[in-house]
């Protein structure tokens, strides 16, 4: 009996190309489901094959349009539950609303990441797979198992393949030091940190570089790139301090608000991302943006969960 017997993968409209890659690696067909809209825009999901007793994975990033993709995911999970699926795992490579994970200084704001966690559990999700959560503590918002996997093996593999000379890993802020230090250790290279601070109110933010960057090939490591404003400014500052080249590696290409044009016109030599979020036409047209596939990592994660094997051992050396 194959270890993939009983394993089924379904997807919504967020990233069907990634789902197709995953099932191709697993050697199984993509689950048959109709995901459409009623005339008033409401989402309709119909599961079009037998899932009774099956181990079902729903692959759906909650990227833009965030609310549509989130509702598709929850409605599909409910449809699968009512069709008697044996176990339902939501594979959410990019977990939307993750940046709203706390109340800063007791501001009157929602902790939206917790709201989303509650909604997914109520819908019937029994396990979560996500990749490079913006805040690790979001795992604690769930009362079900959460496998937060890392894109490090993908990004690290590309860095080793590129074999950049005089490599220096740069953390874009103090909060990213742990991630950047781990990468620097794997690459056996030095680490620099960008310390962003605002000297006083109504004064522009200043970037200070902690570390020697002159003559080095700098690699900025982050979990996501959104508008790319800070990233492009960091690349400019590094070049002004004498860096030969500046590359950026990030897991999630949110790339909103004209980010592709900003990157194209910046001092950044290249931005390397994964395909947890499909690239827009503007991003695909940008010669400085390159995407790596996360399908192999996701397929192996699905397979290990199906077999009952360790997932974290995938990252023992990352």
From Swiss-Prot:
The gene is prs. This is Ribose-phosphate pyrophosphokinase. Belongs to the ribose-phosphate pyrophosphokinase family. Class I subfamily. Signal peptide: none annotated. GO terms for cellular component: cytoplasm; ribose phosphate diphosphokinase complex. Binds 2 Mg(2+) ions per subunit. HAMAP family: RibP_PPkinase_B. Gene3D superfamilies: 3.40.50.2020. It comes from Burkholderia pseudomallei (strain K96243). The lineage of its organism: Bacteria, Pseudomonadati, Pseudomonadota, Betaproteobacteria, Burkholderiales. The active site is at residue 196. Keywords: ATP-binding, Cytoplasm, Kinase, Magnesium, Metal-binding, Nucleotide biosynthesis, Nucleotide-binding, Transferase. Involved in the biosynthesis of the central metabolite phospho-alpha-D-ribosyl-1-pyrophosphate (PRPP) via the transfer of pyrophosphoryl group from ATP to 1-hydroxyl of ribose-5-phosphate (Rib-5-P). Mg(2+) 2 binds at residue 173. InterPro entries: PRib_PP_synth_CS, Pribosyltran_N, PRibTrfase_dom, PRTase-like, Rib-P_diPkinase, Rib-P_diPkinase_bac. Mg(2+) 1 binds at residue 134. Its EC number is 2.7.6.1. ATP binds at residues 40-42, 99-100.
